[in-house]
């Protein structure tokens, strides 16, 4: 959205986009419910004005309010919405959820831990899989798990990598290519590998700690068995006792296909003002026309 708004800030942008035929918005569920999603809505309203025959495609993972997501993307009461078609996959993805829990519950912490007490159990999962993605919720947790795995199991050197947003782009691309070429046994990562990734060799996912949402859990599970009729396998590792309840809830939600809604932003005046200022740097606008456009 940011790059698109910069293009709209350029002089004579209407000439650039006048011949635009289609816009494909990938991973719409990630933008929906954020101010970046509002940026995308505003940019699309401009593109629809500049190109009367514009076609808009939205691609989304499973969310609870898919109809509302379509309405927000295309614009309420718009011709694009009236003439739109919603396509859903009929194939039911098989997802196998397994929990990694300690043998002795008496020593299991109740809060504030990183899950490292179950590191040996995770190594067992890694050894029995072709390639494993180990998802953590923070960069610091990602780095700690990576360091501890190499310290306790130095034989993984050269077969274990780390991937998160603070690592250089060149290194991230190298890791992604190494996964595709099946030269890595495991990758410890964050949400940086949530989206836009198709790694056929990945057999197993490990989620360290609560994923903070069923949709994200399913998204990460789908990184494994990423082919039609293949089974996705994900191991959930609770870092403390309270997350045992979350493990039970996740299994139930996956079984019942219960996914939370992504609530869109309303009345984001700060984003609107920023957008209007962007337009003033290009060719400007008339109040009445921009009101109807938005």
Across the structure, where does each feature detected by a protein language model lie?
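Helicase motor core with emphasis on the C-terminal RecA-like subdomain
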Residues: 1-283, 287-294
